[in-house]
Amino acid sequence: MPNSSIRSELTTERGFSGPASNFNIGHGGLNQLGGAFVNGRPLPEVVRQRIVDLAHQGVRPCDISRQLRVSHGCVSKILGRYYETGSIRPGVIGGSKPKVATPKVVEKIGDYKRQNPTMFAWEIRDRLLTDGVCDNDTVPSVSSINRIIRTKVQQLFNLPMESCVKSLSPGQTLIPSSTVTPPESPHSDSLGSTYSISGLLGITQPSADGKRKLDDSDQESCRLSIDSQGSVGISRKQLRTEAYGHHPLDALECHFQRQHFPESYSSSTHSKTEQALYTLPLLNISLDDGKSSLTSTNTTIGRNLSTHQGYSALSEFTAFSIKQEASDSSSASSTPSSLCSPTFLDLQPINSGCSAPSFSAFSHPSVYGQFTSHVASGRDVVGATLPGYPPHIPSGQGNYASSAIAGMVAAGGDYSANAYSHGAYAAYGDSWRFPSSSLLGSPYYYSSGTRTAPPPTTAGAYDLM
């Protein structure tokens, strides 16, 4: 087959084969029946009419295809379209369609939409068919009507400003809202600027005579806080806009920069005596000096019970007395660490000439005992052990007398100073007890008589288990 051109035959309406013009291989060719075709071009009108005539004569589609040398798919498509629409013209399916959005149709769609803005596209399509504007072949589809409304009809509503101004009468004017400027009268500040929050919300502000003035103390505190926080004030001033006045912003900054929480501790409301207020820095200084006086001593705090260690309570601040008050929230399980908590302590000034009263470390001295001392410079609060804590036995000490434990608890009807013993527990040997001086082996939980040192742990002691 030559590459330049080919000789083909076209089927005429008589069914004979005649010479055809030269076709390019890239645009046309011969089908499987030997008939010529051109890519992208519809079948000639005479061939279409011949297919329909043969179909009316009762010829089968396969015979029509073989006789006219047209593919069976083309014959079926032409006949199906003819039975459906009654037309044999090409381009109805998959081809170029005639323009249905004519100016007359677009104008009618605009009239329908202006008369009833809520009308749907399918209602407009039915209205076009009812009024006879279009027929079944030229009526636009629903999607086409929506596109016409979106692109062409709505442009009539969104006219430019010049056309709107021209349509007005000579005595009427239309001013855009963007050109409105706030009034420059002296009363503009009291009525609120147009661009301010009060102006936008329509809130009328009171006049300058009716405003409440800040007192001198508030203004002075605001000046001090603004001077101390200059960098913050500068950054806030940079964020200001020219629409706001300086006086309302200064008043707002004054309230925000003021300290909201007091820096003093007051006594509890259920206190019976008058208590003075002491600021937080003074309390912190006294606590820091107390810590430094404790750490400055060269004596180490030992754990042996035979030695007495002194704890310096106050070294310089002799004008204060620590008074413990019993409250409802305090319990018998309070520890000496609660002395450092400002919740349970009240500081009370006393005269330098009188001696300080004795104080109890806990609200229930009958259970834990008490120790007293006069608070003075150079004196130490001396105690054998810290109240409320069981005596600690070093790891090297094997026995401990129960009389020391009895001394921790006041003698009474509920407590006995004798050693605790029970027949059920006395039958066990030393190998069944914990030999180490841990929490379970502490005499605080297991109080017995004079306990000797535990025997060395051997493997034979556990053979019975």
Swiss-Prot record:
Chief localization: nucleus
Residues in the DNA-binding region annotation: 26-152
Induction, per UniProt: By retinoic acid in combination with activin.
Classification via InterPro entries: Homeodomain-like_sf (IPR009057), PAIRED_DNA-bd_dom (IPR043182), Paired_dom (IPR001523), Pax2_C (IPR022130), PAX_fam (IPR043565), WH-like_DNA-bd_sf (IPR036388)
Region annotated RED subdomain, chain positions: 104-152
Localization of this protein: Nucleus
Record GO biological process: cellular response to retinoic acid; negative regulation of apoptotic process involved in metanephric nephron tubule development; negative regulation of mesenchymal cell apoptotic process involved in metanephros development; nervous system development; positive regulation of DNA-templated transcription; positive regulation of thyroid hormone generation; pronephric field specification; pronephric nephron tubule development
PROSITE patterns attached to this UniProt entry: PAIRED_1 (PS00034), PAIRED_2 (PS51057)
Residue ranges, annotated region (PAI subdomain): 29-85
One GO CC term on file: nucleoplasm
Tissue specificity annotation: Expression starts at late gastrula stages in cells fated to become the primordia of the otic system and the pronephric kidney. Expression is maintained in these two structures through late tailbud stages. Does not appear to be expressed in the thyroid gland.
Keyword annotations from UniProtKB, A to Z: Developmental protein, DNA-binding, Nucleus, Paired box, Segmentation polarity protein, Transcription, Transcription regulation
Coiled-coil regions listed in the entry: none
Pfam families assigned: PAX (PF00292), Pax2_C (PF12403)
A GO MF label: DNA-binding transcription factor activity, RNA polymerase II-specific
Function text: Probable transcription factor. Involved in kidney development, acting synergistically with lhx1/lim-1 to establish the pronephric primordium in late gastrulae/early neurulae.
Official protein name in the record: Paired box protein Pax-8
Species annotation: Xenopus laevis
